[in-house]
Amino acid sequence: MSKIEKALKRAGDERGNLQLVPAAAAVERTAPWTALLGQQIELPETISRMGGNEGTLLSADELWERGIIHPQHTEEPAVQVFRELRTKIIQQSQGQNAVILVAPVSKGNGGSFIARNLGAAFAFDSAKTALLVDCNFKNPSVHRLLPDASLPGLADYFENPEIDISKIIHPVGIARFRAISAGELREIPAEYFVSMKMRRLIDSLRERYHERFIVLDGPPMSDIADARILSELSDYVLVVARHGRATNAQIEGGLSAISNKKLLGIVFNDEPRIPWRR
């Protein structure tokens, strides 16, 4: 059993209930989370149109090399954990699309690992699409998922008033999954996230596909100003802490920047790679 799964399982084994945070600083959750199984959902036209521009899809082994789960590995604990995270968010949002900020407590806590796999889990569902946005300008990673790491991204969108949003959204080799990299960073202006252009971007990304779930790969919560701004732009926040490394003071300090109404919970992560058996 992976450390991620253990952390989630410790919070409660009651059938249909998933608690992410076994910590005193977390907000208690009482809403029942019921798995969405066996539903017959008509494929939206927007998803059908997306299917024509997927690029070359990656195999399960190729995704493994990139640290991404694959739905074929149905018996692997990590796959089930991310499915449960996805189900919790879908239940919380009452089936509507949502913007989820994934924020590590500090650098090296595995936030990008959680963010990309949460996005992949949404894309597992044939009635959903996912978009991963790299908002961690000091330590970007999403460009590694793209067919060409030099493709334009978020910084290019802010710097170039002529660039269209569609030019920064790229396939990553997974059906129904797209990504926006950090882009070419000449500097890291503090005003990027507070600009109206950022808010308009998030609104546009949300409205473009009503079945799209947007995952923001956020900066560490030690960058409290950016974390607070991005949390205000998001519907929900998922905090990531590396088990045995993040201190209670760090976790509580990070949580102070987040509204209790938006906090989904904390994932305790201690696996740099997906721990399935070979």
What are these regions (language model features)?
Residues M1-R278:
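P-loop NTP-binding module
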